[in-house]
Amino acid sequence: MSRRNERGCRSSSWYAMSTALAVTIWCLLACTSEVIAAASTPGTTPKAKTDTSSETASAETETATSGAATGKKEATPTQASKITGTTIVPFVNETEDMVSVDIDKYPYRVCMAVSTDLVRFGKSIDCINHTPKTPVQEGIMVVYKENIVAYTFEVITYHKDAIFQRSYADTTTNYFLGTSVTKMAFPIWELDEVNRNNRCYSAASRILNGEVYVAYHEDSYRNYTMVLVEDDYRSKNSKRYVTTKSRYHKGAWTWRYTESCNMNCVVVVTKARSNTPYEFFVLSSGEVVEISPFYNGENSEPFEEDTRNFWIRKNYTMKTYFGELAAPKKVVPLMAFLEREDMTIGWEIFPKQNVTCDWKKWQTVSRAIRTDTNTGYHFVSKGLTATFVASKRKIDYNTTTEGKNYNTFRCVYDEFVEEVNRVFEDEYNETHVKDGELEMYRTTGGLIVLWQGLKAKSLHNLEKFAALNNVSVATASPPVTTAATENGTTVRSRRKRSFDNLDDVVTDISYAQLQFTYDVLKDYINDALRNIMDAWCRDQKRTAEMLKELSKINPSNILSAIYERPVTAKLAGDVIAMSECVKVDQSSVKVLKDMRIFQDGKVVNCYSRPLVVFQFINSTKLESGQLGENNEIMLGTFRTENCDTNSRKIFVVGTVGYEYRDYRFRNVTSLEHIDLVDTLIGLDIEPLENTDFKVLELYSKGELRASNVFSLDEIMREYNSQKQHIRTLSAKVNDNTPSYLLGLDTFMQGLGVAGKGIGVAIGAVGGAVSSVVNAVTGFLTNPFGGFTTILLVIGVLAVVYLIFTRPVEYFFPYATQTAVQYAPPGGAHGGLESGPPGAPGLHRRVNAGGSDDSGKAWTSDKKGLERTYTEQDALLILRALKQLDDSQRNEKAQQKATRLPTGILDRLKGNDTSGYQRLPAEDSDFEY
């Protein structure tokens, strides 16, 4: 309502014509009452310490008062003042002053017009271009690594297995005692038979201590050819051809040892490995041959074997493969054979440069960058997250490599050209052209970088246009070769690089990723610093020009901002005179809230800046002035302006601003709500982007495994094939040898030849005893054998009984036969017969018919002759019986000795004298 009343009072003439008279009178009465109330308020000037709310309320009250005064066109007591020259000293009361804020950095001060020091602004600043001068070229990069995979080639081994098998036999079982295998090399003359006809001989000989020992297949004692057939066992790397799949063994006699021989020709087609520098090679079985696989008898390749056992055959004819008689043949330009004690090894000799390559392609980078540093080149690949560092010395891939008699890079040159052409046609054919020739560099990590530079077609056309118009165009790619001047002639020099220390080169690829990380960080930091330096220089240049021009308007403020402290300055021609400002008593400063100028109660003009009253330090005199920028007090109150309608002014004091509406204080405004004029030059710095490193595998697991010439897998597989090839005897020979026999055999063999012979004898006896015992035990445990044994026991008991009952008939069988009559020496009839010498006289009676009656004398009476015999007589009788037994046995022996052989006719004629005797006449069944 007060603002409406104020506007109504200011335009009363126009408003009276358009509104009713009653409203005009009511406004005048209201304004008069407010002016009287304000004039009656007494005032002193205390140190006001009101907050923002009280100040706002005071401002609203005083706004209404000033409006009423204006309406009545009367001078208000607040504007009663005295004029001293051009300075108006205002009257101050507690409702029209306020305390300033933020005087720490910019205290209240008075800057004098008199200056003593002279300063000036410099000339225009020249900004240096900080663009890096590092030449950069884009292109195609192919990276090659050292080939660590071993050279693998085919090797044929020839040997004969002389297999000796020993066994022992008793009555029921054959015992297998063991096998010994002797490997013997093929003689060189027999290799032709094997390689050309797929046959080998069945005999083998060996010289031991100057003696020749010969072994024959199946103990045949014949030397004939046998056909090679493929063995049942095979592997990925080896094929075996043999002549004997089943082993022969001759059974032993009972209680005897036997040993048989099998001759097996074995041809193995296998693989061998050799790695740089190719001084030896290793077979899949683990055999090491100290000869370079490329030694041909004329070159300087390593050779450490016995030359007497080494042969090289030129244009050698042999089978393409073994196992078939009808297999085709081939001609080998160079075939090498090495004879050892246990085998003969053969392999084909190839030129080294045709079958080996020291380098292998690792990565193809279609978009690569080459930067030229002071000491070398950096080949950067963002796709690989790697940087390869190389010297500027190029490698000539068209010349012979130092230390070798051939060019080691020719094997990769064609591949590189093909790869570069493929990438160029696929990605760059429409936009780029090739820049320069193919270049080769050796990196610090032992890699080979093949580089093909590229150039955009637009730049290429610009260079061609400049060349036609004799205008030089600076390119980013510097010359890659150095030149020396001799006698006015430019001579290009290139030094060969030695690869003798190739083994000392570190092949770890992690260094390349570390180098890439460093290059990325370096480029990022350098770009940021370059942007900062450029922005800083441009800002300094602009600021200097602006300050120079602004100093012509307000030199004090400009220099205060430059020196960051309050100073006073004024122009003195083309220079500036500067001096320090004088501080005032900070607690005595009062800022008035009303900026209007009244005369006779009427607003006649307005101050352009707020009024200030203050006191100097150590002074009690009240001074007046106007508030300048940053709390500067400008002496005098002559800075006025015409009052504007709807005026709004904000005066900055520290971090806040005093807001005046229609030249009267309204409130304290925070500067945060007032937008700043953006004079900051943008700093082009972006956060470092994330880089995920790729896992670069320079050599795969397969390559690392293949680089080792000793392949454990192949050696074990070859060993297993040998193990499976050893078979036991067939069912004819049972391996159930008792442990004690094996132990005894081992013990006796350890004693030498004599012990071996003793062992054979002991083994025979022990084996016989063991066989008998085992036979008896087996016979008794058999039912039939047990029954037979019982019958035999019964028979033996019967015989014993008969012997016991008839001892004379058993012991003296001839006593029951018809005896020859003994005639007495004196005649046919005599007294007592004369018996054997020393025998007692025997009485014999002879009948008239010539019959003997003596038997009756012994048998007629059971008591016999009534005669008593002494022990001496019994002894004489036993002796006589012994003599009689001996004479009978001798007689039978003489009859057998004198008996002539008789045939069937003699037997029929009756001339057989085989022991038959004619019966006596009295005993004959025939009558005469």
Curated annotation (Swiss-Prot):
- Where is there biased composition of kind Low complexity? 51-70
Q: Cite the record's Basic and acidic residues compositional bias ranges.
A: 853-863
Q: Which Pfam families match?
A: Glycoprot_B_PH1, Glycoprot_B_PH2, Glycoprotein_B
Chain ranges sitting on the Virion surface side read 38-783
Q: Which residues form the signal peptide?
A: 1-37
Predominant subcellular localization, coarse grouping: virion
Chain segments carrying region Disordered: 40-79, 826-863, 887-928
Disulfide-bonded cysteine pairs: these are: C111-C581, C127-C537, C200-C265, C357-C411, C606-C643
Residues bearing glycans: N93, N223, N315, N354, N398, N429, N470, N487, N618, N667
Q: Which SUPFAM superfamilies match?
A: Viral glycoprotein ectodomain-like
Keywords, A to Z, come to: Disulfide bond, Glycoprotein, Host cell membrane, Host endosome, Host Golgi apparatus, Host membrane, Host-virus interaction, Membrane, Signal, Transmembrane, Transmembrane helix, Viral attachment to host cell, Viral envelope protein, Virion, Virus entry into host cell
Q: Name one GO cellular component term.
A: host cell endosome membrane
In residue numbers, the region (Involved in fusion and/or binding to host membrane) covers: 167-173, 252-259
| Membrane-crossing segments per the record | 784-804
As annotated in the record, motif Internalization motif runs over 916-919
Q: Which family is this sequence assigned to?
A: Belongs to the herpesviridae glycoprotein B family.
Q: What is annotated about its quaternary structure and interactions? A: Homotrimer; disulfide-linked. Binds to heparan sulfate proteoglycans. Interacts with gH/gL heterodimer.
List the protein's name.
Envelope glycoprotein B
* Taxonomic classification: Viruses, Duplodnaviria, Heunggongvirae, Peploviricota, Herviviricetes
